[in-house]
Amino acid sequence: MGKEKVHMNLVVVGHVDAGKSTATGHLIYKCGGIDKRTIEKFEKEAADIGKASFKYAWVLDKLKAERERGITIDIALWKFESPKSVFTIIDAPGHRDFIKNMITGTSQADAAILIIASAQGEFEAGISKDGQTREHALLAFTLGVKQMVVCCNKMDDKTVNYGQERYDEIVKEVSAYIKKVGYNVEKVRFVPISGWQGDNMIEKSEKMPWYKGPTLLEALDMLEPPVRPSDKPLRLPLQDVYKIGGIGTVPVGRVETGVMKPGDVVTFAPANVTTEVKSIEMHHEQLAEATPGDNVGFNVKNVSVKDIRRGNVCGNTKNDPPKEAADFTAQVIILNHPGQIGNGYAPVLDCHTSHIACKFAEIESKIDRRSGKELEKAPKSIKSGDAAIVRMVPQKPMCVEVFNDYAPLGRFAVRDMRQTVAVGIIKAVTKKDGSGGKVTKAAVKASKK
């Protein structure tokens, strides 16, 4: 193996019928962690129900169904490798909570694969005003996914017949659109593919001799490796807190930024509890340090399960510790809300692992979604499609951060009527004074060391 491969998280976006499952399934199928036995089983099942043509998509559908039933599948099934990198598909739309997952998702995507259906009529539908292609590209960019590879899929369709003209037309139109969204078009690679036939997926297609660029796998290999935020102060949102006999209280969560070591004195916000980290475990092994991306359990001294809970954030007491937010200002994009939203609206916000109602205390201005320019000061209300700067007040104690400082704690989904009605990124936070919280004996002792 030699040098460790670069790990990249990918999100797959695009219109509902663009062929995302087939293209993604094909990559996983050809370069992935699915063993031949499983594939043969899927193929037989697909044939039995007369859907043999869906074998690649079927792979993904099976995985999705298992995921939705809450069966955590071996994540290897969602991985595929290239000579340089290991890619994990962290989400593919079509999944009910796709938008919410993209925001509160267990991991930030390092790049997006935008899949476009090249067939006559299909491309037009996807890129039209109501098409999801635009929405997904804008969301990905707003949430900090700055690298993208665009696949012009279905080049084998009879209306396209592997033709260069259609490809050029699509490249021109999509480039103009994603440039408006904010992407640097010079850095975005376009690849004409057939997710079903396999053209230009892994091997160069003989049916498109006019295309001189990379295959999809090569284009993915050319993406810039992500910078993991280990040099930032520690932020670890809690997913759960367990009480384990003979050990004590064990919070569990994923390190988003920074590093945590045994012996560190940490503060939990908004609980405002400070204590010492006794030990850290991952996959039942003791760790000398936990770094970004690690899902860990750690033992804390003199803290009861009642003191801290899911949604709390753990940070280092001596290095910009987390604090409760009194209020915060965010740029909010309304996606689908049936009515007008005015001051006083109080939906639930999903931000990192917290799930708390927040009041739209003051809609300060309506802005242009792309440029951020102010369009209207203090509008009476905002509706679907609008973007606004809003001052928000949590209705219960909550810990959030500015997106530019701690991205995973600075983006949120607004949930109402069982769907994601808006997304936002946090621009500023007014923090409460953290003094006067509970400091355990262990913390005092450790601080003197």
From Swiss-Prot:
Q: Which CDD domains does this chain map to?
A: EF1_alpha, EF1_alpha_II, EF1_alpha_III
Location of region: G1: 14-21
Location(s) in or outside the cell: Cytoplasm
Per the record, which residues fall in region G4?
Answer: 153-156
User: Which key words tag this protein in UniProt?
Assistant: Cytoplasm, Elongation factor, GTP-binding, Nucleotide-binding, Phosphoprotein, Protein biosynthesis
> Got a GO cellular component term for this one?
cytoplasm
List the residue ranges of the region (G3): 91-94
Q: How is it modified after translation?
A: Phosphatidylethanolamine (PE) is a direct precursor of the ethanolamine-phosphoglycerol (EPG) moiety.
Q: Which InterPro entries does its entry note?
A: EFTu-like_2, G_TR_CS, GTP-eEF1A_C, P-loop_NTPase, T_Tr_GTP-bd_dom, TRAFAC_GTPase_members, Transl_B-barrel_sf, Transl_elong_EF1A/Init_IF2_C
Q: Where is this region: G5?
A: 194-196
GO MF term set: calmodulin binding; GTP binding; GTPase activity; mRNA binding; translation elongation factor activity
Keyword match Phosphoprotein: yes
Q: List-wise, which residues carry 5-glutamyl glycerylphosphorylethanolamine?
A: 362
Among PANTHER family, the record links this protein to: TRANSLATION FACTOR
The job of this chain, per UniProt, is described as:
This protein promotes the GTP-dependent binding of aminoacyl-tRNA to the A-site of ribosomes during protein biosynthesis.
Q: Which family does it belong to?
A: Belongs to the TRAFAC class translation factor GTPase superfamily. Classic translation factor GTPase family. EF-Tu/EF-1A subfamily.
UniProt protein name: Elongation factor 1-alpha 1
